[in-house]
């Protein structure tokens, strides 16, 4: 018998962690939110919070043993994963420590997909210094993408059009890299037709479920807008589902995975994977009967998922800060919410820098184009001000 409430520890308390915390609280769980800074979004929902460096193994271990959670849900990449492997013998880690370690570094998940599972990816190579970068760039060809092997939200990513831009791209990737690695990945630029996320849910009963595909656009590797359902042929969707299942089956565990693909014609090209709710999946806050965070919690807790329904054409658009401040204030909610079937979710971040993601607008309509226009209008209505 599954006894509730469960005590859940979130390692990472940003906007996605906040929505996980909300979903957990609605199921009666006790939530402990952890992050490196105070008043992070999920901490505003949680029963308890801890502020510390989660990359520090001894600090992480101390907090885990002090709080003694039933379940640990990593929500960010920058973690002392060796501790999770040790802790996993006593406490459930979602989806598991291996999946967390594999997906926190682009090289590990890319090697798994391409080399072990023989799944089509963009051509890629690695470099640990400028000389290797120059050599591999000539082999892959221009234009190409350069990324840190470990970063989040597209930080440190550059599109390089010729060799004269390599040095600047290298410096940016190293500067924005998380952790101690100076390793970067060079990646073939694919002139794709569409970029999608396939939310893939592994359940404790052994079954895998899929949400309707989500189309999205990025700027410098960072999510800007998404829409659901993305228009795919039946054969392309089937290929994407097969690949997502192969990779997530290899990683194991339970929960929701965000699996990203490039679509070019009938070709499906694996891009990246997150073993947790995905930022592009914020559109499910309006599009589905169960949003991605609720699906994640149900899978984690062993609660049935009878069906996943995508109600109608829906879209999201991020709300970005226009200034740096520690006293966040904004206007425009009245205008943003004057449209039907539209909502705004502000994340409650305690400070902003120019371009920081502070919220998301979501909308639904009869068509994807109409939903995207409504979401765009709502997001543009929010203006940040100095009080």
UniProtKB/Swiss-Prot annotation:
Q: Which Enzyme Commission number(s) are listed?
A: 6.3.1.21
**Residue limits of the ATP-grasp domain?**
111-301
Its keywords, alphabetically, are:
ATP-binding, Ligase, Magnesium, Metal-binding, Nucleotide-binding, Purine biosynthesis
Task: Report the record's Gene Ontology biological process terms.
Answer: 'de novo' IMP biosynthetic process
Q: What class of enzyme is it?
A: ligase
Pfam families, alphabetically?
Answer: ATP-grasp (PF02222), PurT_C (PF21244), RS_preATP-grasp-like (PF22660)
Record-listed N(1)-(5-phospho-beta-D-ribosyl)glycinamide binding positions: 15-16, 75, 279, 349, 356-357
For molecular function, the Gene Ontology terms on record are: ATP binding; magnesium ion binding; phosphoribosylglycinamide formyltransferase 2 activity; phosphoribosylglycinamide formyltransferase activity
Q: Which pathway does the protein contribute to?
A: Purine metabolism; IMP biosynthesis via de novo pathway; N(2)-formyl-N(1)-(5-phospho-D-ribosyl)glycinamide from N(1)-(5-phospho-D-ribosyl)glycinamide (formate route): step 1/1
Query: What catalytic reaction does the record list?
Result: N(1)-(5-phospho-beta-D-ribosyl)glycinamide + formate + ATP = N(2)-formyl-N(1)-(5-phospho-beta-D-ribosyl)glycinamide + ADP + phosphate + H(+)
The record ties this protein, via HAMAP family, to: PurT
Q: Which family does it belong to?
A: Belongs to the PurK/PurT family.
Relate the assembly described in the record: Homodimer.
Which NCBIfam families does this UniProt record tie to the protein?
Answer: PRK09288.1 (NF006766), purT (TIGR01142)
- What is the official name of this protein in its record? Formate-dependent phosphoribosylglycinamide formyltransferase
Source organism: Prochlorococcus marinus (strain NATL1A)
Lineage in the entry?
Bacteria, Bacillati, Cyanobacteriota, Cyanophyceae, Synechococcales
